[in-house]
């Protein structure tokens, strides 16, 4: 249910913001406004608005496709549900709470590069859920490294290779610059996703290696 709610809320807020320029400007990530005018809400709200409908559709489609299997693991793993007392609200909803923490945390972490680099630039703005979606994609790669993904919707490659290509491409484009895309936000979001999993489920790292070794052998 959590993913459906995230998609619905993001779609509603994005459509509203696209129809109201003042609302869009109020919710965008503007590091200058965050740092100098304490408009801290922007580090989260920017992840729920998009520049156009294609941007919105692509991010929510990727979140839906990659997020569902992750959410299933979060909600079904005994290791997660036994972390806290199942009788209290947090414990009984631990899986969905972890997913929500991961997603919101990724939105915030993805904003960090811009906050550092553009804190004195009042003209810089950023928006979109791409940083959080990058976290979701890389967690999928970590949990299902040997599953098949389709590059450009046509070329079948294993998920772990897609993960490698992601980091190579985003790193190159971030260094190149001039694209108008916050590639550093994608990188920070993806790295956060991997770190999040390493913290809540260290076995996911060894499991990743084990699955790769099994595939090679």
Regions from the language model: what does each represent?
Residues 1-217:
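A detector for small-residue-rich transmembrane helices and their helix-helix packing motifs
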